[in-house]
Amino acid sequence: MDCFHGSLVSARKNCPSASAQSQVIDEYLKEEILHHSIAGPFRCPPIMNLHINRFGVIPKSTPGKWRLITDLSFPLDGSVNSLIPDSAAQVKYIGIQEAIDKLIFLGAGALMAKFDIRRAYRLLPIRTADRVFLGMRWRGNYYVDLALPFGLRSAPKIFTKFADVLEFLLSRVGSITHIQHYLDDFFLVGKPNSNECQSALSTCFHLCRE
């Protein structure tokens, strides 16, 4: 996670949205524990000097769905994110022009497909030594995040490294010729009047499930 010890200040309370959507928080923690992405609940901190972060939820684009965000930037001068260097957070994303170039190369009628990775960040485990930075407190109990959290300054770069490797591996398999990604969104292109795009999409689904 490339975070260095310093004068961290633990949060005393969570974001207002956590209290406003307490049932959402309860369900989220229950689900993440089932996925082994969060450890808890613990009556006492399970790790010595566990740093406690505040958290809240924001609505997703799908009605009724929520995303938990760990506020790793609070307080400004005593947060986890304040200790992460710029070099660990800088990431270069693909531009729309690269996707356009693929379409132009294949010509009019080119077929396109898009898929994303379910749970994305939450698939990537946090190394044991960094878990001390990712404590949470809810209803008097302590929890420890075991997976890459939304709100971590270096999370996009960390996930992009994973997605870059996945794109490379998929591009070397069978019919997957034209593929690129932006974070967890993958874009496929196939020749006009062919099953190239559909075949590539099916292959991606099969390999990712494995």
Task: Give residue ranges: language-model regions.
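Short hydrophobic/aromatic-rich motifs at helix boundaries and adjacent loops
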Residues: 1-2, 135-139, 175-178
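Non-catalytic, polymerase-adjacent accessory regions of viral genome-replication enzymes
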Residues: 1-17
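Hydrophobic transmembrane signal anchors and adjacent membrane-proximal interface regions, especially
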Residues: 6, 14, 31, 180-181
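A short small-residue
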Residues: 8-9, 143-147, 183
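Low-complexity, intrinsically disordered/propeptide-like segments
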Residues: 11, 114, 172-173, 210
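Catalytic-core region of right-hand nucleic acid polymerases
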Residues: 16, 20, 24-160, 207-210
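Active-site palm subdomain of RNA-directed nucleic acid polymerases
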Residues: 156-209
